[in-house]
Structures are given as C-alpha cells and as structure tokens.
Amino acid sequence: MKARHESRPEALAALLAKVRACSACAHALPLGPRPILQLSTSATILIASQAPGSKVHQTGVPFSDVSGDRLREWMGLSADEFYDEETVAIMPMGFCYPGRSGGGDAPPRAECVHLWRDQLVQLLPAVRLTLLVGSYAQQHILGLGAVTPRVRNFRDYLPTYFSLPHPSWRSRIWEEKNPWFRGDVLPALRSAIQRARYGDQERNSGGGTDGLGSAGRPGVSGG
C-alpha cells in the first residue's frame, strides 16, 4: 500500500502548528512566545514585516494597531481584504513580540528566520508580490542597503518585491520629508497589489501601467 502524500495545505497547517508551539527563544521574550502569522497556500501577496508590537501580542492579530491602519491605507485595502488569508499572507522576520530596546521595540529575533522562514516560504507557491516592510525584511531579502532609496527606486525590484518603510508613527515624519512617496510610490503600490490579487483580470480591465514597467528584477531567494 502506497504511503499517503501530504497535500501542501496539510503540510502548511502541520508546520504552523510546530511554529506556534515553538519556544526556542522564550527565555529572551519579556511577554513569552506568541508567534503571530497569517498564511495560506493560496495567498498571492506576502507581507514580510518586522515583528509584532505589544498591542499585536495582546490581540494575536497581525497589524491590529495604528501601524496596521497606516499600512492598509498605503496598500488601498480594507480591513476585510487585508485579513483575507486566502489572498494576503503576513510573515514577520520575528514571529513574536521581542520587547523594548531604547526608544522603541527591540529588533526581531533571528531564530525565526533560521528555524522556520524558508520552510514556510516553500509552502506559499502562489505568491506573486512580496512587500518588504522596513529595514529588517529588506536586508534579509535584498542585502545591505538603506530604506529610502529602495522605496524610491521601487521599480528596480518589481514585479517580485516592493520595498516600504515601516509604518510606525515615525513614518509620518518620513513622509513629510519625502513627498514623492504619496505622489509616485503609493499609486504604483496599489496597482501592483491589484495585479497580484487579480492577475490578468486587472490588466484587462483597462488600467494603465501606472509606471510599473514590465521588466522586473530577477527573483532573490527568500520571500
């Protein structure tokens, strides 16, 4: 009798169960481990972010804070659209709230990347667009570099990646210093998101190119 092969959704569910039971860095987490992700094998958009904040740790819902409100506004998505896991996957670089350091949250713990990230990415075959939100995600995927030029030169990384600043309260100050973000980047971001959600349906609806161009940067392993 042949062994039954696990389907990709079953494999993802089994792996997520292991992730949510992980205690590899429990000793370093002031509020204890609570991995917070939103993943489905059908998702076409992946948000690679930093790490949950303290409010998100309490709710267990990714981006259930002011940063999430700002990110959804940038993306042009309603809360219902954003939390539709069949379309939008959310996987931070660190899955748990890392605590505080200096004037803000501590950097995401590195254990999640080493233990889980590649395994999870392999089970997200439908992803067309990955949003790299903040410096930690950008450096992991793209290598060393500054956030602002990567955001401004977003076309260099399409159609696979789209770099964004972290949507914390500090991003308002950053936006005031960089007015091209709302003028040039956000319209292109929203167009890229609709293309990732609907594929050729959006293109055939009569929409223009919105400055996205057709030649994307070769994919970088990760996601």
Positions of predicted regions on the chain:
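Short, intrinsically disordered C-terminal tails of secreted or membrane-associated proteins
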Residues: 218-221
